[in-house]
């Protein structure tokens, strides 16, 4: 992290150990975010599972340091629009990194509207 800071440029440093090694206990000394879960899958049961696991460590997050339940699956086609809305809201309420995981060149207008929801982004 110190080497990245010396560049003088803002850099978001994300750690990924797939939720192992109790990364939520030490991640904020090294990075800005750390994965608390296994890879998310493009299905509702995976979204809920990752949210519940991520929610076990709220004390680890703070300004400039976030628990990361993995990227957003909004726009990838495996969720209904209601599930996509819920997925985005859960990540926003959890203060999770809102990392878009779909192809923005092909995403539907409805899914893009979810990703651009200013109210949820403001909560996040």
Whereabouts are the PLM-identified features?
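Alpha-helical scaffolding within the catalytic cores
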Residues: 1-3
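Glycan-recognition surfaces
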Residues: 5, 9-103
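Glycan-recognition and catalytic regions of carbohydrate-active enzymes
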Residues: 68, 99-124
């Amino acid at each position: 992290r110190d080497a990245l800071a010396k560049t003088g440029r803002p850099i978001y440093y994300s750690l990924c150990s797939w939720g192992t090694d109790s990364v939520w206990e030490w991640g904020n000394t090294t990075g800005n975010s750390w994965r608390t879960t296994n890879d998310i899958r493009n299905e509702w049961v995976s979204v809920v599972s990752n949210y519940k696991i991520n929610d076990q460590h709220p004390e680890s997050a703070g300004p400039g340091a976030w628990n990361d339940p993995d990227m957003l699956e909004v726009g990838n086609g495996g969720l209904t629009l209601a599930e996509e809305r819920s997925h985005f809201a859960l990540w926003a309420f959890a203060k999770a990194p809102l990392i878009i995981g779909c192809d923005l060149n092909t995403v539907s207008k409805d899914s893009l509207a979810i990703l651009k929801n200013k109210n949820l982004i403001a909560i996040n």
